[in-house]
Amino acid sequence: MTLASAPAATESCNSFIPPSFDVNKVEIISDRPDCATFIFTDEDHTLGNALHYVLMKNPKVDFSGYSIPHPSDNRMNLRIQTKSNITAQESLLQGLTDIKDISRHIFETFNNALDQ
C-alpha cells in the first residue's frame, strides 16, 4: 500500500503535500493501525533523522526509528509505534507537518535577521 492509497491518510495527506511530491514513493507495511513501517524511496538520513526527532517529541508516539538498509540502496525505512488513540499514519503526517512548520519558522527568522 502507498501513502496515496492509505484509507485514513488520503484526505489529510492531500491537504499539505505539495503537488510536486510523489506520494507513491512511500510504501506502507502495517501490522496494526498503531504500528507501521514506512519505506521512503529516494530519501536518506536528512529526512529520516528529522522525522525521528519530531516524532519522538510527540507524546502520542511510543517508538520511532529509521534505518538506511544499505548505502547503495536509495530507501529509508521508518518504523512508528503509537499509543492506541492515534494511528501510525496520522503521526507520520503530523510529523511531516511539524517539519514543514519548523522549516518555515527557520526560513522566516533567517530572512528577518537579514533584513535588519
UniProtKB/Swiss-Prot annotation:
It comes from Dictyostelium discoideum. One of its GO terms (biological process) is transcription by RNA polymerase I. It comes from the Eukaryota. One of its GO terms (cellular component) is RNA polymerase I complex. PROSITE patterns: RNA_POL_L_13KD. Its main location: nucleus. The gene is rpc19. It is found in: Nucleus. This is DNA-directed RNA polymerases I and III subunit rpc19. One of its GO terms (molecular function) is DNA-directed RNA polymerase activity. DNA-dependent RNA polymerase catalyzes the transcription of DNA into RNA using the four ribonucleoside triphosphates as substrates. Common core component of RNA polymerases I and III which synthesize ribosomal RNA precursors and small RNAs, such as 5S rRNA and tRNAs, respectively. Component of the RNA polymerase I (Pol I) and RNA polymerase III (Pol III) complexes consisting of 14 and 17 subunits, respectively. InterPro entries: RBP11-like, RBP11-like_dimer, RNA_pol_Rpb11_13-16kDa_CS, RNAP_AC19, Rpo11-like. Keywords: DNA-directed RNA polymerase, Nucleus, Transcription. The lineage of its organism: Eukaryota, Amoebozoa, Evosea, Eumycetozoa, Dictyostelia. Disulfide bonds: none annotated. Belongs to the archaeal Rpo11/eukaryotic RPB11/RPC19 RNA polymerase subunit family.
